Amino acid sequence: MADRWNAGVIPYAEMGYWQPDYEPKDTDILCAFRITPQDGVPPEEAGAAVAGESSTATWTVVWTDRLTTFEHYQAKCYKVDPVPNTPGQWIAYIAYDIDLFEEASIANLTSSIIGNVFGFKPLKALRLEDMRIPTHYVKTFQGPAHGIVMEREHLGKFGRPILGATTKPKLGLSARNYGRVVYEALRGGLDFTKDDENINSQPFMRWRDRFLFCMEAVNRAQAATGEIKGHYLNVTAGTMEEMYERANFAAELGSVIVMIDLTIGYTAIQSMAKWARDNNVILHLHRAGHGTYTRQKNHGVSFRVISKWMRLAGVDHIHAGTVVGKLEGDPMTTAGFYDTLRKDSIKADLSKGLYFDQEWASMPGVMPVASGGIHAGQMHQLIHYLGEDVILQFGGGTIGHPMGIAAGAEANRVALEAMIKARNEGVDYYKEGPEILKKAASRNRALDTALATWGDITFNYESTDTPDVVATPTNA
């Protein structure tokens, strides 16, 4: 073994970044990386390289390490396990001392953990599968601007999922016609409607016009139904100043909720979360762009990690998968996402892709959003897989209804209430779901038409991101 202080290049494992006897501290930030080393690179060296390059190391020995307590600041790869049934891949467990990170900064956390290692030549591929964020670090963050409980109290809606829809077509409508869609959907029975991720302020519909017509629709629908309604006004823009201007205008109009896209960046998300809490406005996050780095199983960042970062950052909603819809969503993996967002205390469960216990230290939960290819005929499956604290967004499943938008909203509301009633009466609603829907449809033409239109539509493709311990393709 080379002397740690010999000039030149020394293997990372021999510089202290591989420590199989290390016992992680309660205050350490722990990471589970899926590593695919280049041929001839031992997994221990690959894990040590990730630890080194994401903490204190560079490619050669530097004498200035002696000016620090380098053993304290070095990340330590303390375990490397082979991935079951996947030759050439390992899970490397790495511990980082809490002193390596600035308090309450997702930008600093991510710059360290994922900032410089994903293009590292000794690795063919690298994926951050999970993190354990210690209570000591969790408590430095604001967390969700409101959280699940406060949102329900704000809206006065309890005991069932929240219903929503994305306005379609998402591009091309004038502001007036856009507002008409919002009104019909809310009047028909939905709780929320929303802008989609790429509606900002385009030539066909400027943001101020959209906000005015949407809030007119919200107010009229509230007056007609006696229920609190909302429309996710997307305030995403090119600068923080412009986002604040749009958000402030939304608040002045009385909107209960605004929306941002994941693409605005972590610091902007935290800034908007602070604004949302200060202004008593719910904050919805669309996970636009996440699939570019979360979907592939061997390289990138798992969405369960993004879920943890966004809970810390302070959003109230985030899209988290449907299981039965058109987008990627293995049942067990999706359950892990939902647990991460909603639960106060989470136990490691490899069947859900959860590598660590996680304590949230009373930080409020984030309301998951299920959207993309779902319809009223799947209501029993959605409640079974996703539970009660979820927002179910039926965009095409509302606006594509043959009888019109209001009828589409009515069909979804009737299906939901029939399923919740059956659940509350002790009926096995998952097993009896089709019969429950059929019975409800016999008394409601809108639901009957929805079932006739979409009843046989499914998206049963095998998921790319499944837990390694069990083979669980999407199966609805």
Curated annotation (Swiss-Prot):
InterPro entries: RuBisCO, RuBisCo_large_chain_AS, RuBisCO_lsu_C, RuBisCO_lsu_C_sf, RuBisCO_lsu_fd_N, RuBisCO_lsu_N_sf, RuBisCO_lsuI. This is Ribulose bisphosphate carboxylase large chain. Pfam families: RuBisCO_large, RuBisCO_large_N. Induction: Transcription is 27-fold up-regulated by growth on H(2)/bicarbonate compared to pyruvate, RuBisCO activity is induced by growth on H(2), H(2)/bicarbonate, formate, methanol and CO. Its EC number is 4.1.1.39. Belongs to the RuBisCO large chain family. Type I subfamily. Heterohexadecamer of 8 large chains and 8 small chains.
